[in-house]
A protein has these predicted regions:
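Intrinsically disordered, low-complexity terminal regions enriched in Ser/Thr/Pro/Gly
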Residues: 1-174
Length: 174
């Protein structure tokens, strides 16, 4: 019997951050609130969050669900009574597509945030979903982002390319 022994030193730095924190955004194809399927590998905090590994939504998968966890809401470093949560969606050109805000109570130290977005009318493109948490009184904030794709071949985008020949013509000929 052949074997090889490898010894290596590994330094692990524990995550001991005492201020506001947020997990990565998990995008999902399906989310079941209050799931009783606690043995599922997709079970988290009473939700069954079924991932979508290719991150492609649109005609065949019209709804994107998201799941994220927020930590240390009761940190002494935070000054505001509420933490502002901004959910922002950008297209591949950086254009703001949608924005929504809400205030998060600090009555518990951790919380789960979930939501959904219908994408059946979005044109084919790549998008970035950003969640930002802001403590306005201490002027601090954190954010996390997730890129995903929408494929909707039936949605025709009006060309937004604008031209202005007037300035060029007048400078050349005027």
């Amino acid at each position: 019997e052949m074997f090889k022994e490898i010894k290596e030193k590994l330094k692990i730095t524990p995550y001991l951050n005492k201020t506001l924190g947020i997990s990565d955004i998990q995008l999902a194809s399906k989310m079941i609130q209050g799931s009783e399927n606690t043995s599922s590998i997709f079970y988290k905090n009473t939700y069954e969050v079924v991932p979508i590994p290719n991150l492609v939504f649109g005609k065949s998968q019209p709804v994107a669900f998201f799941y994220t966890e927020i930590y240390n809401l009761q940190s002494q470093l935070l000054k505001s009574e509420f933490i502002k949560m901004r959910m922002i969606l950008y297209n591949s050109k950086g254009k703001l597509i949608k924005e929504k805000s809400k205030n998060l109570s600090r009555n518990s130290n951790t919380r789960v945030e979930v939501g959904s977005q219908i994408l059946s009318n979005f044109p084919t493109d790549s998008y970035t979903f950003v969640i930002a948490l802001i403590d306005s009184l201490s002027s601090t904030g954190i954010s996390t982002a997730k890129k995903f794709f929408v494929y909707n071949p039936d949605i025709v985008v009006a060309d937004t390319f604008e031209t202005s020949t007037t300035a060029v013509l007048s400078s050349t000929f005027g």
